[in-house]
Amino acid sequence: VVHISRPVDGPTPTPTPTPTSRRLFLALAGALAAAPLLDVRRASAAPAAKGLDDPAKKEIAMKLVSSAENSSLDWKAQYRYIEDIGDGRGYTAGIIGFCSGTGDMLDLVELYSDRKPGNVLARYLPALRQVDGTDSHSGLDPDYPKDWRKAAQDTAFQQAQNDERDRVYFDPAVRQGVTDGLRVLGQFAYYDAIVMHGDGTDPTSFRSIRKRALTKAKPPAQGGDETTYLMAFLDARVWAMKQEEAHSDTSRVDTAQRVFLRNGNLDLDPPLDWKVYGDSYHIG
């Protein structure tokens, strides 16, 4: 999605990333083979570093995004969320802000219909194909919002939201973060950027934001300092947000992600305290 910040209502959304823990395990196995006298029991008991795809860290990520998108930590309450927020992208809905005007809502409903033919949203597929790329509600009104909320009670639709969130936004962000040598906070910064800006080729897309940051600093994988690079990335993100009036409130970066960065909390370890739109949030 090229997504809009919205301080309002609505619960839980991908090639598969290589988990950080798996790579660490393979590296450990190689070290054990090279040093057979090493105490295997002690080595295997050493805790592996966690990435954003660790379940507990992913839950934190969902809450952080929900605080910015829905002014609530209850991200699972957002499956049913749907409204036109006046950003030119038609209806925005669900746990990650799927939009009728940007194609990802169409992809979601197609996935749901493949898994559950004849569902309450399937009849809107022709209309969703027609309005893709526009802010039109043609063929959707008046019943689409009501039917979306009805579908959101179906665990199959909830799972479809989760899976599309992971395929389009979460997994690519984590993969790129790992490639760049970033820890949990950096992976989250990438994820939040993709949620709002998408991963297209326009000047404010995630990949363009990353390229802008790379002109100022190198990520750890290229020998750079992680904090310095992340500050450059967040600077580039703020620049991108300010290019569009609807995104001009940068508090989800300046009073959230920058706070964690300045505190040196590169692994997003609780407790976490931050603000978005002036509202305070806490994860213990």
Residue ranges of model-derived segments:
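N-terminal secretory signal peptides
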Residues: 1-20, 28-36
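Cell-wall polysaccharide-cleaving catalytic domain and substrate-binding groove, primarily
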Residues: 28, 32, 46-156, 160-180, ...
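C-terminal region of N-terminal signal peptides and the immediate post-cleavage residues
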Residues: 36-48
